[in-house]
Each structure stands twice: as structure tokens, then as C-alpha cells.
Amino acid sequence: MAAIIVVGAQWGDEGKGKATDILGGKVDYVVKPNGGNNAGHTVVVGGEKYELKLLPAGVLSENATPIIGNGCVVNLEALFEEIDGLEARGANASRLRVSANAQLVAPYHVAIDRVAERFLGKRAIGTTGRGIGPTYADKVSRVGIRAQDLLDESILRQKIESALDQKNQILVKIYNRRAVDVDEVVEYFLSYADRLKPMLIDATTELNKALDAGKSVLMEGGQATMLDVDHGTYPFVTSSNPTTGGACVGTGIGPTRITASLGIIKAYTTRVGAGPFPTELFDKWGEFLQTTGGEVGVNTGRKRRCGWYDSVIARYASRVNGFTDYFLTKLDVLTGIGEIPICVAYDVDGVRHDEMPMTQTEFHHATPIYETMPAWDEDITDCKTFEELPEKAQDYVKRLEELSGCRISYIGVGPGRDQTIVINDVAEG
């Protein structure tokens, strides 16, 4: 029995899809515990590149059952477009299951999200405009639509009517937009009901019974620690808890059943959208990391902001999540750059901070304190063991491990599934 959580340790785009793809072939279930189609991940299988958004990467595994958990928000149009796109390429998504308690994104959620961002102007958060935040807001306000509501049209209509009593006031009186018709929303949801119903399960019961029977579960977190609504760079965050604790809540698997918490972290740092980023680069090295690392968002097509490795964030993420292991990705991108700066602390208005500053104001004022290490020139993309890495690459990895306070058990040396050095396999305990 293994219950493994995969969590992004930075601001997303760390390579969680690759980690999940590698581990997904060794487990019985792969579950997405949070988020929606607002964050994408890329998986390379057999030389084929797949860009997934709402679906767990485990959908590409031949054996694992992929599940969208109760902590997710599901845009049905996006879900079935993604399924159809995969199946058109020969993939089999028939094993996919959806928690009956997952929240559904309604057309009015998307409308409110987009108009609200435009309304904020320069103060905009930089959301993807896919209705994720408004859907989570309705969830905690207890007026959300759940997947199980599609099983009873009368309940579905009643909930939509109740929600639109409020939403139309917002759209018409605040944002000067037209009111949303109840029948249109009901018809929208019912158009997907027949396809969705066979997928619905009591995910919490099924997953816990699977663990009782000695089976293995992998929880694939979306977004990342620094985008967590409680622990991230608020307000420039997502609307859920993409951390270890959030994975437990988003699946119904209790924390005492977790056998490994695997943090995914790049050998440098990236971020998409607005918000503070102490090690961000605006020179040729930022452009180099962006170009060489292929740093363009899967979901938005936006170029990612790039910077050097930030060990303050790495230590913080280790503590917040209780990581047992790190999966270091994109080490190959740093080949041949001469010297590699590592942020070991911050200077905040003349005061050294070895840990995350307490306030966001301080974090906005943080400037990195660097130490440098020599880079390597050798091609590492075919290295299969840690010992095969050049000595300078080994030294860099060891230093990151020391600074993060967590062992590095996997090292990505290229985009392919087989371009991964495995030091300690968490799927095997």
C-alpha cells in the first residue's frame, strides 16, 4: 500500500506531469485533488507530447484508474474536449472517473471571472479567465453546483435558479452585462449529463477501500505551493490549496495514510502572471532560461517569467508540505552557462532573511542574496545514474539538497520519461 502526493514546490510548471507519468505506471489510481482547467502540464510518452489541463496525467497510464477528485472544479465542455482530443490521437480515456462531489464550472462563473479581471484593470490578479475562482467562491458560499446534481434535473434547476438570483445582480448592476437565462444554463449542463453520469463515483470510499486492499494511490496536485490560497503569495494565488494538506482534503484520504509527499522543483525558478518574484531575471540569462527551457505556459501560451533557484522558497515549501523527497527537474537546461547563482537568503530593507518574510510587503521588498557554483559543460541528457553526472552537476544537486532540507530522489535531465535519474523510488517505499 502506498499513498503518494505530488506537489509543486514553486509557482507551478515545475514538471508535475512528468513525475506523475513516471509514477503513474506503478500505482493503481492517479487522482487530481484540486484545481480545474486553469493549469496545464506536459507529458512526453513514446516521443509523443501531450498537453493536459483538466485531466490527470495518469490518464495516459495503461493500468492506473484516473480520477478527478472532490476538490476539483470541472468545466464539462473543457473536460470532454480534452477527452476527445486524446482519443483522436489513440489514447484511451475510458477509465476516467469523476467524484460526484466535484464542483462544476457554470457559464456564469466564466463570465464573472473575465469581466471582473477587466474591471480591476492594473490591479488584476492575472487569472486565466476560466471561472475557477468564482466556482470555488460558490463552493464555500454553499451555492455551488456539484457533479451529482446532474443526476436530478429538478435539483439542478433549483440550484441554478438560486445561484442566478445573486449572479445576475452582479452581472447587471455592477458589471453592466446581460442577465444569464436559467434555461440556458440548465440546458448547458444537461447536454453533458449522459456522458458524465457513467463516470461519477464516490471517490473517497473507493480510494480508501483500495488502500485497505493494499493498492496504491497517487495524488497529482495542480498549481503549486506558492500559489496556495493560504500559504502562497496572496493575493497573487489560486483559489484552492495545492499543497499536501489540500490533497488530503481534495481526495478524502486522511493524512495518516500518506506514505510519501514528493515536491517537484525546477533547477531554476519560473512564474506565470502577476506577483512578487525575488530572483526574476530581466537580462540575457532570463531570456536564455525561457528559450532553452521552453518556458511557455501550456494553458495560456504566456511566456513564463524566469529566475535563478530560490532556496528560501524551497525550504518554505518543504516545511509547509512536509516533503519526504524532492524531484528536481530541468537540470539539463543549466548545462554550459558558466556560473549558476543560487539564492540562499533575502535582503529586505538591509536586513537578512534566511526564511520567508512574514508579510507580503516585506516579500515585495526582498532582493536575493546569491552564492554561485560552477556549471558543467558535458551533455547530461543520457545520464542514467547520479554517478554518471559530471562532478559539478553532482555538486549543484547536493547543494540544493542541503539548502532545501529535503533529499532529492529524482533528477530530470531531459523532457522524456526515460530521461530521469532515480535515486530513491517513493513508489517502492
UniProtKB/Swiss-Prot annotation:
The lineage of its organism: Bacteria, Bacillati, Actinomycetota, Actinomycetes, Mycobacteriales. Gene3D superfamilies: Adenylosuccinate Synthetase, subunit A, domain 1 (3.40.440.10), Adenylosuccinate Synthetase, subunit A, domain 2 (1.10.300.10), Adenylosuccinate Synthetase, subunit A, domain 3 (3.90.170.10). The keyword Nuclease does not apply. Substrate binds at residues 298-304. Its cofactor is Mg(2+). Pathway: Purine metabolism; AMP biosynthesis via de novo pathway; AMP from IMP: step 1/2. Keywords: Cytoplasm, GTP-binding, Ligase, Magnesium, Metal-binding, Nucleotide-binding, Purine biosynthesis. Mg(2+) binds at residues 13, 40. Belongs to the adenylosuccinate synthetase family. It comes from the Bacteria. Homodimer. PANTHER family: ADENYLOSUCCINATE SYNTHETASE. The gene is purA. Its EC number is 6.3.4.4. GO terms for cellular component: cytoplasm. HAMAP family: Adenylosucc_synth. IMP binds at residues 13-16, 38-41, 128, 142, 223, 238, 302. Binds 1 Mg(2+) ion per subunit. This is Adenylosuccinate synthetase. InterPro entries: Adenylosuccin_syn_GTP-bd, Adenylosuccin_syn_Lys_AS, Adenylosuccinate_synth_dom1, Adenylosuccinate_synth_dom2, Adenylosuccinate_synth_dom3, Adenylosuccinate_synthetase, P-loop_NTPase. CDD domains: AdSS. It catalyses: IMP + L-aspartate + GTP = N(6)-(1,2-dicarboxyethyl)-AMP + GDP + phosphate + 2 H(+).
